[in-house]
Amino acid sequence: MIELKHVTFGYNKKQMVLQDINITIPDGENVGILGESGCGKSTLASLVLGLFKPVKGEIYLSDNAVLPIFQHPLTSFNPDWTIETSLKEALYYYRGLTDNTAQDQLLIQHLSTFELNAQLLTKLPSEVSGGELQRFNVMRSLLAQPRVLICDEITSNLDVIAEQNVINILKAQTITNLNHFIVISHDLSVLQRLVNRIIVLKDGMIVDDFTIEELFNVDRHSYTKELVQAFSY
């Protein structure tokens, strides 16, 4: 379970980015955080990951095995390491897997799942496309077997086929390994396919919180309706 109680945060004392955030996410629930750029979505993710401490309030995680997948994969990889080295480092660090043959077998399995060519393993991050690197980024996090996954705009560099592939993989992971994941996105179609609950942020505050089945209810907040209408165009 993840619980945020009256969480307030700002990068300086004069302006708070998030104000009085209250969220409870039970195990097995996948949640989307929706809102415009600058509303505090990524800051909220950073707080859950423990990268920042709230100015006020408390954050409780029942499981410490929480990992992120960030929007810009190039900054997530060591530029001097091959893709293979980065992936195997995750297997060693998070799972204690040192046997090279076992590592290779896991990589081969995941390459097939993510529809990636094994020849890319010898490349540096700068030598593969943005879409390929983002899929490797997702793969690396899943190889570490986290219980909770924080996904920040992870489909932004993917074409529609690769996007659906990643979505299918993440959904399958909730059945096997993940307790749940939190998806930060401005793309409503991604959230509709991935999560069963959406929390809407506006100006650092929660203005709406509903299940995916309630998305088009007439009692949705006016800002939620604006986002839905904008996306429909």
UniProtKB/Swiss-Prot annotation:
UniProt-annotated binding residues for ATP: 35-42
Cellular component terms (Gene Ontology): plasma membrane
A GO term, aspect molecular function: ATP binding
InterPro entries: AAA+_ATPase, ABC_transp_ATP-bind, ABC_transporter-like_ATP-bd, P-loop_NTPase
Catalytic activity field: Ni(2+)(out) + ATP + H2O = Ni(2+)(in) + ADP + phosphate + H(+)
Membrane-topology descriptor: Peripheral membrane protein
Keywords: ATP-binding, Cell membrane, Ion transport, Membrane, Nickel, Nickel transport, Nucleotide-binding, Translocase, Transport
Primary enzyme class: translocase
Primary residence: membrane
Family that this chain belongs to: Belongs to the ABC transporter superfamily.
Annotated protein name in UniProt: Nickel import system ATP-binding protein NikE
Source organism per UniProt: Staphylococcus aureus (strain bovine RF122 / ET3-1)
